[in-house]
């Protein structure tokens, strides 16, 4: 004699989030207010016999099961549980407003630096000495750094005499469109960019009387050096 198994698709209820002291009797007691109950069981661990925190309740009819599932998060034995039809699966418990909070995601580049301070900028070697790292400047000082000329002043040129600077400036006017200096040998310049050199005398434009006077003064300052033609006589 074969018995037909009853369809429990719409009558079997999954109950999750149960406290560990909930028993079959206490689970049945809670759901019996919604209608007739065919079965109420708390799933336990086979080895320890303790509750695993969930169970199943089978109601006698579909209407009773719908009434039992009307509240998806009832309080059972002092703890908020989650109730749903078993064929739909477990339904997560709804968090109360104020408990859930979001954390703003930060860029990986900002996490490594406190307060999002911008990183130091390394300028191309065509503008400054290789290896020099210039820190980020404030917006108020950004206007001063927009000029294409970088003024190398201070102690960097203290070891050079006034006569040497004047001679270098006078010789540079014959071949280059910008002033050159022995101190600038370690610096590389690109087309259209130059650097200003502090000079003890006022440089004049090429081709003027002032430029000729400056060149004569520089030649007089270096009178101890032999003219370039002596080098040619030595080779002969």
UniProtKB/Swiss-Prot annotation:
Gene Ontology CC entries for this record: cytosol; nucleoplasm; nucleus
Any one GO BP annotation for this protein: positive regulation of stem cell differentiation
Gene3D superfamilies: 3.30.70.330
Region (Necessary for interaction with EIF4E): 175-199
RRM domain sequence ranges: 11-88
Record-linked InterPro entries: Nucleotide-bd_a/b_plait_sf, RBD_domain_sf, RNA-binding_reg, RRM_dom
Swiss-Prot/TrEMBL keywords: Cytoplasm, Differentiation, mRNA processing, mRNA splicing, Nucleus, RNA-binding, Translation regulation
GO molecular function: mRNA 3'-UTR AU-rich region binding; mRNA 3'-UTR binding; mRNA CDS binding; pre-mRNA intronic binding; sequence-specific mRNA binding
Highest rank taxon of the organism: Eukaryota
Induction profile: By p53/TP53 following DNA damage (at protein level). Up-regulated during embryonic stem cell (ESC) differentiation into cardiomyocytes.
Magnesium among keywords: no
Nucleus among keywords: yes
Xref: PANTHER family: GEO13361P1-RELATED, RNA-BINDING PROTEIN 24
Domain notes: The RRM domain is necessary for mRNA stability and mRNA translation regulation.
Subunit comment: Interacts with EIF4E; this interaction prevents EIF4E from binding to p53/TP53 mRNA and inhibits the assembly of translation initiation complex. (Microbial infection) Interacts with HCV mature core protein; this interaction, which enhances the interaction of Core with 5'-UTR may favor viral replication over translation.
Function noted in UniProt: Multifunctional RNA-binding protein involved in the regulation of pre-mRNA splicing, mRNA stability and mRNA translation important for cell fate decision and differentiation. Plays a major role in pre-mRNA alternative splicing regulation. Mediates preferentially muscle-specific exon inclusion in numerous mRNAs important for striated cardiac and skeletal muscle cell differentiation. Binds to intronic splicing enhancer (ISE) composed of stretches of GU-rich motifs localized in flanking intron of exon that will be included by alternative splicing.
Protein name: RNA-binding protein 24
Organism, as annotated: Homo sapiens (Human)
Name of the gene this protein is made from: RBM24
